[in-house]
Amino acid sequence: MSDDIKKGLLGIVVDETEVSKVMPEINSLTYRGYAAQDLCEYCKFEEVAYLILNKDLPNTIQLKKFEKEEKNNRDLSKDLYSIIKKMPKKSHPMDVARTAVSIMGLEDKETTDSSEEANMRKAIRILAKTPTALAAFYRIRKGKNIIKPKKNLNIAENFFYMCFGKVPQKEIVKAFDVSLILYAEHSFNVSTFTARTITSSLSDIHGAITGAIASLKGPLHGGANEEVMHMMNKIKSPNNALKWINNALDKKEVVMGFGHRVYKSGDSRVPTMRKYFAKVAKIKKDKKFEKIYDIVEKVMIDRKNIHPNVDYPTGPTYHLMGFDTDFFTPIFVISRITGWSAHIMEQHAANKLIRPLASYKGNKHRKVLQLNQR
């Protein structure tokens, strides 16, 4: 293969962005210039969502207005609730999220308006409704009644309430909120580039986010947090961890939750999420997954010099919170809607159709024979 061909667009800079910057050389990630770790420390997810969408952190009045608009748009139409009830219970929640957002596009009165103002309003509506749709399916597939959203709860609290009927301890809510902040945006990743590619054809925001969700479902992208939990469940006990991971490496198996296309010496989001993973484990009085985590991480670094990515601590954290494993990536969706929406609006602002080239390696020109001659 020619050196001119960059499989996976490796190392290719395709555009500029103001939304976020990944700096692997100093192990840092910033949203609009603010370090993600600092945002986790001093802000709640709603503030970060506002920042990503509006380019600056909100003041008290701006945040109150943003939160009011989000809360007023949480409930779903009767038709969408009905459709979710009819979805097969075995459906993967990512497929439910993708379908729900697509239907939101059918129902939205501003679907054909792609002005920045309309896209901002639609982004907030998608952010508000997607957790409700996912929580509704979470309960339906368990044979339970849907719990409607409450306006006196923030996004993190409300999702717990709609899924479980109650809001957990504030430390667990904070850990969930931190995960939303860390998952909110990450430059030109696969799903974001998918959203921008769709947008470049002047398609609508619902279509672009639907495509992004489909991209995020893959285990090499968002689905990795689910695979991490499947791996830990296979290991079962800290006593098995050392043997399991060494055996996996000896067989040259892929160990999910490790490595990153950009970060080579460690994902900048991991230390923060690891800290909150420990806090949740302490509250739940369950150290098993923490012990497995540490053993597997040490072997991966010692033997392969491969560090964990943010999916590695997030998977067991969500598990300890009580979420089903196949809901881990849909939670990622709830958060990343903000990043996708910001990139969609940025693409619209200076658009050029994304149309790369391919080097043909198939047959040369061939003569077509009629059917009776073949």
Map each language-model feature to its residues.
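Non-transmembrane, aqueous-exposed alpha-helical and coiled segments at domain scale
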Residues: 1-374
